[in-house]
Amino acid sequence: MITDEIRERLLALRDVKYRDFQIKLIPGKTAEDSIGVRTPELRKLAKEFAKRDDIGDFLNDLPHKFFDEDQIHAFIISEIKDYKTCMAEVCRFLPYVDNWATCDQMSPKVFKKHREALAIQADKWLDSPDTYTIRFGIKMLMEHFLDGDFDTKYPERISGLRSAEYYVNMMIAWYFATALAKQWDAVIPYIENKRLDIWTHNKAIQKSIESYRITPEQKAYLRTLKIKK
């Protein structure tokens, strides 16, 4: 089976020191469910196995046993060239994504050519009860709709989200920090008017101040907008 073949290849690339370092950064992951394969090697394997006629057997074999298998799954999905097929695989995989790393590594190339359909699906993801599905939806709006396809309806939608989940709120902060760098005039009112919860508001400001894309003048102004607890 292709799943066994992929697992054997991953185990052959095991780096125990890297695994032990990595699991400290990813809550919930342990030495028992992580192999320790470095990202460049995972990407190489993903490109290789994505060409296989039987790759669907691996993509259907959910949930996976190892974190590294989730990672290679995300990279394989990112290589799918047909939009409908790719979107179907993303939607099937997202409920099994249980960590920020797998969520953030998944970035299908084909989405760039289908932004209208992507925007509709991203809006649905934001209504999900699953932490990493919401995070992925925000990430897609950040990656694809802050430049030429920007519309204020996107920050408006995201500013209305409320969650007790750290990894949702951190992505909201990341979104607004990136949005301030790319669409300052349209997005700064969300900070001025305190449209986010206090923690996310202050985190968005912090991340903006840390960004080289924000001017010194903008950073100075943002400092005046911090909410003191």
Residue ranges and their predicted role:
Residues 1-229:
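Alpha-helical scaffold domains
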